[in-house]
Amino acid sequence: MADNVDQWSAAGRKNIFGNTVKVVEMQSEAGAAGAVHGSLGAGALTTTYTASQGLLLMIPNMYKIAAEQLPCVFHVSARTVSTHALNIFGDHSDVMACRQTGFAMLCEGNVQEVMDLSPVAHLAALSGKVPFINFFDGFRTSHEIQKIAVWDYEDLKEMCDMDAVDAFRKHSLNPERPAMRGSHENGDIFFQHREACNKYYQALPAVVEKYMNKVNEKLGTDYKLFNYYGAPDAEQVIIAMGSVCDTIEETIDYMLAQGKKVGLVKVRLYRPFSVDAFVSVSYTHLRA
């Protein structure tokens, strides 16, 4: 993924802001995360790509990025974290290790969903002031060759909140607007400051849903925080996220044809987890 961006940059391809993206290769994922942190602090919209052990090396900087309300997106092709042996295939053991960093987590199940919903992560990060892990299954999704409908840059530009972009840049380190960062706090005030960010996470599901609705309007899709597939009065429901959802949907079609009442709740926004949205979808279709 990063290699494609590098090729586009070398070819002079412009982004929605009319700029050629600068690509920097660091010595390791730890260095990449530090560079992302510094770049964001200087007011540059920044993203990175990683997976598995590489993502784990980024965790210390992820805590800082999230706590400083720096809107970025880490695109992660989720892969197994190697233990007694190397395993390069897709599970979620890497992204699950990042649940408490403060990053929001958005998941896609196939190549078309990655194309459609990746902008939602970027747009919601800017408006919501919360960084995102945008993840999909390694190899099963990240290396699948598939024909997809791609975004028109003008459509993306229309959805981008330029006021949020300006606010982010004004928040950057600048000698004309001196501010203190990286201070030391004792326990009496540290906890209060840490909890002060809760309101952003409480508001974030609505922000994500807003941009999903904008995507739906432009593409004719039906993306929600949680999507349901199956019988309207299901007696058995599977809750899943990632590429397995496509397989489950085919299985549900087969079982519905046999008269079985089954369904699937597809999780898209995993963090922050909206209990209200989850309960609304589940109880609408699940027969007690």
Residue ranges and their predicted role:
Residues M1-A97, G102, P119, F139:
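Thiamine diphosphate
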Residues N4-W8, Y63-I65, H122-A124, A149-D152, ...:
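Short, solvent-exposed amphipathic alpha-helical segments in soluble enzyme
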Residues F17, F132-N227:
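Conformationally flexible catalytic loops at phosphate/diphosphate-handling active centers
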Residues R79-T80, F136-H143, G242-V244:
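Glycine-rich beta-alpha junction loops
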Residues A85-I88, V207-Y223, A240-I248, V267-S274:
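A general structural motif
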Residues I88-G138, M162:
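Conserved thiamine diphosphate
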Residues P232-K260, F273-F278:
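Redox- and metal-dependent alpha/beta enzyme cores, enriched for Fe-S-associated oxidoreductases
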Residues T284-H285:
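Conserved small/polar residues in nucleotide/adenosyl-binding loops
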